[in-house]
Amino acid sequence: MSRLKRLTFLVVIVLGPSANPSQAQTAGQPDHPAVTVQGQTYTPRSILARNMGTAEDQTTPFPPHKIIGNIYYVGTRTLSSFLVVTPQGNILINSTYERNVPTIARSVEQLGFKFSDTKILLGTHAHGDHQEGDALVKQMTGAQVMAMAEDVPALQAMKPGGKEHPIDRMLRDGEEVTLGGTTLVARLTAGHTRGCTTWTTKAQEGGRTYDVVIHCSLRSPNAPTPAVIAELNRTFERVRSLPCDVQLGDHPAQYNLQEKYAKLRQGGPNPFIDPASCLREADIQEAMFHALLAEQQKAGQP
């Protein structure tokens, strides 16, 4: 039995067949307020359902593929994981659930790279669907795990199978992570979590350089506190200020992965190079944020 197969078996045994949280979370989400952005209507429930999909969606690999330059998609249908390839080893962004790590490893290998060449592991925010698998990735590859300082306490509370969550480097807003000539900048875009991290980098394709933004979730809690309200106001302002040619996110639906991948397979211009869509997700989430605030104010909440 190969090492990846053994690890897959072990993960299933440790985690068991329990249902993914998406169904319970979606059922607990309100179907109001409703906002309409670019002709489409959204509610808190529909946004979460769009992001998480079904339990099967969360674990089924999406076809691994090149996005642009040295950036590749290696995640599932509804949970993004990105591979940044460099001559000195690779950077993985978002391990997702621990049970998905062997799947991500296989996607990396299908692209012709070695999962063992993962030197750095980054994440967008301290929720299990994005960073629960960090300890297993480190166990398999020895990668250095780096995270925004504000999210470290929540990350360390994640202990799948009793594993301690590794943190090799705590990052601050604006710090750079560099490997093999590629630099990613950690941008604090708090609100969804205290250390929600949007990553920016540059990619080359066809003799041109493009600005790539990998968004952390911009989704507001249904009853944001004054502190979270202040954080999200700063975050939306910041996100709108970032140079962007290619917008990615921690859930594929946030940047229309399926539609863009279908166009990519047809040939022609790279559909991921789409500056006009860079703020679409911010528009949706900011509209919902203000609608939630209006409801909260109407109900007499602080």
What are these regions (language model features)?
Residues 1-4:
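N-terminal secretory signal peptides that target proteins for export/translocation
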Residues 8-18:
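Bacterial N-terminal signal peptides
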Residues 22-89, 298-302:
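Zn-dependent metallo-beta-lactamase
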Residues 25-30, 275-302:
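C-terminal regulatory/interaction regions
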Residues 27-30, 71, 99-102, 108-176, ...:
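Active-site HxH/HxHxD metal-binding segment of metal-dependent hydrolases
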Residues 57-111, 115, 198-219:
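Conserved beta-strand hairpin/beta-sheet module of binuclear metal-dependent hydrolase folds
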Residues 70, 84, 94, 125, ...:
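Divalent metal-coordination and catalytic microenvironments
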Residues 90, 96-99, 166-167, 176-178, ...:
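Metallo-beta-lactamase
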